[in-house]
Amino acid sequence: MKKLIAVLSMLALFAVAGGARAQDKDKAPEKAAAEAKAEPAKAEARADAKAGEKKQAAAAPAQAAAPATPKCGDKGFDCNKGDIAWMMTSTAFVLLMTVPGLALFYAGMVRTKNALSTVMQSFSIFCVVAVLWVIYGYSVAFTAGNPFWGSFDKLFMLGEDPATAVAATFSKGQYLPDFVYCMFQLTFAAITVALIAGGYGERFKFSAMILFSILWFTFAYLPIAHMVWYWDGPDAYTTAKAGEEAAAHAGFLFQKGALDFAGGTVVHVNSGIAALVCALMLGKRNGYGKVAMAPHSVMMTAIGTGMLWMGWFGFNAGSALEATGAAGIAFFNTLFGTATAGLAWTLTEWMVKGKPSLLGICTGIVAGLVAITPAAGYVGPIGAFFTCAIAGIVCFFAVTKVKSWLGYDDSLDTFGVH
C-alpha cells in the first residue's frame, strides 16, 4: 500500500511539472512579443544616455576654464569658517574680561563708597575706546604708515566690504574677515585702558578719567600696538626682496624681532607703567597709611577673578588667529601656568604671613595670567610652569614689599602685578 501511495505521489509531481512546462511554452511567444515591443524604448534610452555623456564631456572644458569663485577676500584667499567662529567666540571672551570681569575684580578691592564709581569706570572706558577704535584706532594701529604710526585709510572702516575685506593670519593663504579681526583687537585696546584704573583708583574725577583715557589710548596704546603687532602678513614674504620690502612696512619693534604672542608688551607692560606714573603723579590717597583701606568685598573680587580667567582663554588662545595647534598650546598654558602661579603665590604667602588668603590666590592667578600672556603660544608645559611659578613669587613681593619700600600708592596693584 505504501509503495502504491509513493508511486501515485511521483506521478502527481511529474504531472504538475509537465503542466508548468506547457504553460511556459504557451507564454514564450507572449514574452518574445513583449520584449520585441520594449526593445525600441531601451534603444532610445541608451541613445539619450550617450547624448547626455557627450554634453557633459563638452561642458567639462568650459567648467575647467571658468575661474574659481573666491571664498573670502578680494584675492580669493580662503577664510576658514571654523577660524571665523573661533575668533568671534574669543572676542566675546575678551569682552567678558573687562565687563564685568575687571569691573568686579577692581570694585571688590576698593572701599564701599567707591565701588560703584569703579565699576562705572570700567564700563565707560570700554564704551569710549570701542567708539574711538572704530573711528580711527584700528586704522592707526593696523595699516601701513611708518614704523611708529599707521595711516587713516580705514577711518570708520569706510571702503571696507564685509564680503571681501580680509586681515592676515599667521598661515599663508589663510585670512580672517577684517571686521572680525577689528573687533578682536578692539577688546584688547579697551581692557588695556581699563587696567590703568588700578593706579589712580579712588582719586580721579569722572571727567578727568575720560579725558585721560582718550589721550592715553591715542598717544600711548596705538603707537605701541602698531610697533609690536603690525606687519603685512605671511603672504607678503614670497622672496627675499619682497620680504625686505614687507619688513620695511612693519612696526618698529616687529622689525627688531619682538615676540609678543598675546600682549605682554602692548597690554600689560604698557598699562602697568602707566598705572605707576599715575600713582606717582597723583600722590597718595587721603589717609593712606593711617586709615584702614581694606577691600570691601573679597567675594566680589573672587567672582571677577573667575571671569577674568575664563575670558583670558579667548585673550591668549584667540591670539593664534586660527583654530590650530598654536591655539591649543596657548589654551593649555593659560590653564596650567595660571594654576601654577596661584599656587606659588599661596605657598609664598603662607610661609611669609603664616596663612594664605582668598585675595592672595586671586591676585596670584591674575599674575599668572599676565606672565603667560606674551609666551602662551611659544612655550611648552615646562616653560609655562617655571614662568608662572616665578611670576607668582615675584609679584607677591612686588605687591607686599616693594610698594611700601618705594612709597607709592598703587591702589589696586596694577604695576606690581602687570
Protein language model features and the residues they cover:
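N-terminal export/membrane-targeting signals
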Residues: 1-23
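Hydrophobic alpha-helical transmembrane bundles of multi-pass membrane proteins
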Residues: 4-5, 23-417
